[in-house]
A protein has these predicted regions:
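Condensing-enzyme catalytic core mediating Claisen C-C bond formation in acyl metabolism
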Residues: 1-61, 167-248, 288-297, 381, ...
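Phosphate/pyrophosphate-binding loops at sites that engage ATP/ADP/AMP, CoA/4′-phosphopantetheine
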Residues: 71-87, 231-258, 277-282, 358-366
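Intrinsic-disorder-associated, low-complexity terminal segments enriched in Asp/Asn/His/Tyr and depleted
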Residues: 490, 515, 521, 529-531, ...
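A conserved active-site cap/scaffold subdomain adjacent to cofactor or substrate pockets
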Residues: 221-230, 237, 241, 257, ...
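Conserved catalytic cysteine-centered active-site region
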Residues: 43-66, 95-151, 282-350
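Acidic, glycine-rich active-site loops and adjacent beta-strand->loop/helix elements
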Residues: 24, 92-98, 125-130, 155-161, ...
Length: 551
């Protein structure tokens, strides 16, 4: 089949979404229970109260650039990509170390030896929304007339640190890179996306000389839950509208029963558990005649007349619906909290860390034929996956629990000292980071030095040995060795026979890739295969699609 060319009005790529997903988190952590004792707070305040077990944090040698360099390099290496197979690179982050120079420009150093500077995209910054906005931008590019047949890469990365006090245990750090293109195992659905935006001073960073945010905790939680309410309402309305237009629609309101799994942006795990209860409250109030004498809504009759806007601070409502939704939480959400509970809040990558955690612990059979709801505070996405290519994506994340176990535990007093030193050296010129980079994971990029003009120099360690840019990039696979066999095209845009053959034969951690030489897509809603997963997202933006069997 002909490959899609820019400006083609006859076809657009089919099943655009996430082809591969790579996760990076720091190599050291602090135990939350030990941090409770060190901070002199009551036992369980961080562990039971917040639902957090451990918190990852960055060493002095790591910054937002090094995190993103590491995760992009790892995505390319494990996927056997060539650097010239990437035509767009988007970065979502709120960790700003330069008011003008984007993180994306630093990442372009990885492309240098390939000669590929024709890479669109830039940084997107708006608290935790930037990652999902970047994903939508990348997908829109692939689906647009500007697409030139290459992949897009989306990077979400942040370092979440707080001043000493109650907020510090809700920190974390990490980065996630996603490969975006056609025929993906996780597909961004068309037709279901709801958005909620508003102005609020709940969380912001007005002091550019500090990494620490200004936070109004109670207001921030209220904003989070209000966004969840409004986006779920928009999502439900659009989903029900699609049902009515479908030929074989399932009658009745859209409810949590329509999701097999639910994943959320996770500032701390306890808020996610409350959010599941919040969604159940929405279903309860929207139900025409809920049965309160038994079943899911048993005993909830006293709350039948409440208004959502009056319940954000009601502990009675929160407790009742959290208890009623406990089994839903255990089945649909708890498996996704592995990374959040053990590494903490990563900001822009947070919800994608939950997606990675879910994929790392579920089989393709668990996910096939189901819908996954995803709430990203600030936005959302939807996806589906055929069971075969989904297997390959799952296998690439199978080592996530082992990687968490391989980290180094740091005593709370040492953690506090590292945070103090980080505060003192933040944005310091003519500076060499304290300590050794050899404690980082092998293959991690690190900050080597900041010169007197604030220019940052990076290197990559491999088993403790420093590797400069030039040595690292000479071994990059050629286009013919990458998984992007579709890029082996003749001048007419037809995929060459050799290029087509590569598509199903390339080795790698994800195994052979599906055929990408056919990219024709009808924009009308199509029947889906019974063994496909739908991931519908809820947030300040929401996307999803009805799942139905093949005609």
């Amino acid at each position: 089949h002909p490959a899609a060319l820019p400006g083609s009005s006859q076809a657009c790529p089919e099943d655009v979404g996430i082809l591969a997903l790579e996760v990076y988190f720091p190599a050291q952590y602090v135990e939350q229970a030990e941090l409770e004792r060190y901070d002199g707070v009551e036992a369980g305040k961080y562990t039971r109260g917040l639902g957090q077990q451990q918190m990852g944090f960055c060493a002095a040698h790591e910054d937002i650039n090094s995190l993103c360099l590491t995760v992009v390099q790892r995505l390319v290496e494990r996927g056997r990509l060539s650097w010239d197979a990437i035509g767009r690179l988007e970065v979502g982050t709120e960790t700003v170390i330069d008011k003008s120079k984007a993180v994306k420009t630093v990442l372009m150093e990885l492309f240098r030896d390939s000669g590929n500077s024709d890479v669109e995209g830039i940084d997107t910054t708006n608290a935790c929304y930037g990652g999902t906005a970047s994903l939508f931008n990348a997908a829109a590019w692939v689906e647009s007339s500007a697409w030139d047949g290459r992949y897009a890469v989306v990077v979400c990365g942040d370092i979440a640190v707080y001043a000493t006090g109650n907020a510090r245990p809700t920190g974390g750090a990490g980065a996630i890179a996603m490969l975006v293109g056609p025929n993906a195992p996780l597909v961004l659905e068309r037709g279901l996306r709801g958005t909620h935006m508003e102005h609020a001073y709940d969380f912001y960073k007005p002091d550019l000389a500090s990494e620490y945010p200004v936070v109004d905790g109670p207001l921030s939680i209220q904003c989070y839950l209000r966004a969840l309410d409004r986006c779920y309402a928009v999502y439900r309305r659009k989903a029900e509208s699609q049902r009515q237009q479908g030929e074989r629609c399932r009658r009745g309101p859209f409810t949590l029963d329509d999701f097999k799994f639910l994943i959320f942006h996770t500032p701390f795990c306890k808020l996610v558990q409350k959010s599941v209860g919040r969604l159940l409250l929405n279903d309860f109030l929207a139900a025409p005649n809920p049965d309160t004498s038994g079943g899911l809504y048993k005993g909830l009759q006293p709350f039948r007349g409440v208004k959502l806007e009056d319940t954000y601070t009601s502990k009675e409502v929160e407790k009742a619906f959290q208890a009623a939704s406990q089994e839903i939480f255990n089945q649909k959400t708890k498996p996704s909290l592995l990374l959040s509970s053990r590494n903490g809040n990563m900001y822009t990558p947070s919800m994608y860390g939950c997606l990675a955690s879910l994929l790392a612990q579920c089989s393709a059979q668990d996910l096939a034929g189901s819908r996954i709801g995803a709430f990203s505070y600030g936005s959302g996405l939807a996806a589906r996956g055929r069971s075969s290519p989904l297997d390959k994506l799952l296998s690439s994340l199978a080592d996530l629990p082992a990687r968490l176990d391989a980290r180094k535990r740091v005593a709370p007093q040492d953690f506090a000292e590292i945070m103090k030193r980080r505060e003192e050296t933040h944005h310091l010129a003519n500076h060499t980071p304290h300590g050794s980079h050899t404690d980082l994971f092998p293959g991690t990029w690190y900050l080597e030095r900041v010169d007197d003009k604030y220019r940052r120099q990076y290197a990559r360690n491999s088993g403790g040995a420093k590797m400069p840019f030039s040595q690292l990039l000479t071994a990059a696979p050629s286009p013919g060795e990458s998984l992007g066999g579709q890029f082996l095209m003749d001048k007419s845009g037809e995929a060459t026979r050799e290029g087509s053959a590569l598509l199903g034969a390339l080795p790698g951690p994800w195994g052979p890739w599906p055929d990408r030489t056919s990219v024709r897509h009808q924009r009308l809603q199509r029947p889906l295969h019974p063994e496909q997963t739908v991931l519908g997202a809820m947030g300040q933006s929401l996307e999803g699609q009805r799942l139905r069997g093949r005609d």
